[in-house]
Amino acid sequence: MPARCVALRFMFSSVWLSSLLFVCGAVRADEPIVSEKDSAIHVPTPAAVVAKMLEVAKVAKEDVVYDLGCGDGRIVIAAASKYGCRAVGYDIDARKVKESQENVKRNGVEKLVQIECQDIFKLDLSKATVITLFLLPEMNIQLIPQLEKMKAGARVVCHEFALKDIQHDQKLTVTTQPDGVPRDIYLYTLPLKRVVEK
């Protein structure tokens, strides 16, 4: 496993110890953010990766984008700001939800973006046309049954961790600056296609 994945796993594991859900969104910094109250680590998605995730999903004004584990709300804010689409961010951490809501207002996209405090594993995802994920592989696996209920043509975009045993339609790597770290992005289109072992 690449060193960057090991490091990310360590940070994600720290979050599991302090909360039920790791969340990772993205608005400016790429550095891990440590909550003062519970030491939970939130790893923001770099802006360049956010932009590429939305681009590869071919987000358009008519789309409805869900970000599961929205952190500071940067992905849904970027989607609404650039493409004029509706977007919903979900997070189980009430403080991150409040932060996201403040960022939504600050960016003037309240009419397009909602932020909700919910358990992502209990969501009905059928109304989403695009879903963005930056979660641990185990969490991605747990979400697959929900993702499979999305409508044909809907897209799922994963940052760094792929959906296990699901064939991706596209994989690309974005090298972020100034750290020079390569970050993988995986695109899936519904219906999801299982990997067939040869």
Task: Name what the model sees in each region.
Residues 28-61:
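Class I SAM-dependent transferase core
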Residues 9-24:
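Bacterial N-terminal signal peptides
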Residues 74-85:
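Conserved SAM-binding loop of SAM-dependent methyltransferases across substrates and taxa
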Residues 138-198:
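C-terminal substrate-binding/active-site "lid" region of AdoMet-derived donor-dependent transferases
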Residues 93-127:
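S-adenosyl-L-methionine
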Residues 62-71:
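Conserved class I S-adenosyl-L-methionine
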Residues 126-142:
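A short SAM/SAH-binding and catalytic strip from SAM-dependent methyltransferases
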Residues 86-91:
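Conserved SAM-binding motif I beta-strand of class I
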